[in-house]
């Protein structure tokens, strides 16, 4: 028995950041879910359903500190071991690929399900996203990065999201400079944090305190300003001309990827942001994010993380993206195309085998039929229906509902 109880007026409250969906929004979300999964299937991505809860050592293996602090933890009453409620499905899919996908052929997986966070997103204020995404394992070339980005853009467009623009970055640029400078893990972490904040004065001071060559110090600080569209790659090649081969290889990968995106998705503006390092601790190459005007953060993001399966005994090249279905729904145009009760057909409370057969035939054809209950007050018009079943001789036919004003 609980040592306390809530006042009766508070029992309907949900925990902070936990939402429920009422019928209209839930039905729109389900419509979007089907569209997303159908689009994944059309590209050959096979649906997997990882468990909501796992042993913590499996759930967080190779995932990093950020995911650890976002994960709810509890004790398994059956085994006594520590469990975690998933906060991100990406490591789970990596485990599935490592354990079940035989051979070296590419593995294409998609997923969609609820995740839970200990801390709310600063913009959405939610701790219960519905995460969906796609992962491509077993190919390390630019073609797989391009495929995943194209898939992400197509899924968002299919969902009704408009005016998408894309940001591209590459963690190999910062990582290459850090290796060239011989930074310790602590020093690298400090510069990483300042770059994410785009805090140029603090970054300049931090770099000045390190014992590194002036050209390297300059390259670190100039990363903050290497963002935008036209001319960014030319400026980057000039600013980073004294960087090592790994940095130049990363720049070339970005340039080629942007060129190919321009060929296949010319309607999508592409921006570069060489200080963009989200997921730096486990991502290994290209990183990308989709944005729309008027929304203060990305609506989908992803990148390459070739080492994520190593801890499961099989390190395969990997790239993928993820997004929150609830965020995409809010930014999509599905509200206008939603099929609500106005499109349903009203059936009277009449015991007639012919009526039952007519209702079954309509439902088999994909129509919505709502049957009145005995004693129910109000006719079809009173309940807002535009169509109803009426007897016409021996048959029941769908007829328009006369307006209450006529």
Swiss-Prot record:
Ordered alphabetically, the record's keywords are:
Amino-acid biosynthesis, Cytoplasm, Histidine biosynthesis
Transcription regulation keyword on record: no
InterPro entries reported in the protein's UniProt record: aa-tRNA-synth_II/BPL/LPL, HisRS-like_core, HisRS/HisZ, HisZ
Compartments reported by the entry: Cytoplasm
**A GO term for molecular function:** histidine-tRNA ligase activity
Superkingdom classification of source: Bacteria
> Which BP terms does GO give this entry?
histidyl-tRNA aminoacylation; L-histidine biosynthetic process
Gene Ontology terms: cellular component:
cytoplasm
Question: Which pathway is this protein engaged in?
Answer: Amino-acid biosynthesis; L-histidine biosynthesis; L-histidine from 5-phospho-alpha-D-ribose 1-diphosphate: step 1/9
Q: What does this chain do?
A: Required for the first step of histidine biosynthesis. May allow the feedback regulation of ATP phosphoribosyltransferase activity by histidine.
Its family remark reads: Belongs to the class-II aminoacyl-tRNA synthetase family. HisZ subfamily.
Q: How does it assemble?
A: Heteromultimer composed of HisG and HisZ subunits.
Query: What else does UniProt say about it?
Result: This function is generally fulfilled by the C-terminal part of HisG, which is missing in some bacteria such as this one.
Give the HAMAP family listed for this entry.
Answer: HisZ (MF_00125)
* Protein name stated in the entry: ATP phosphoribosyltransferase regulatory subunit
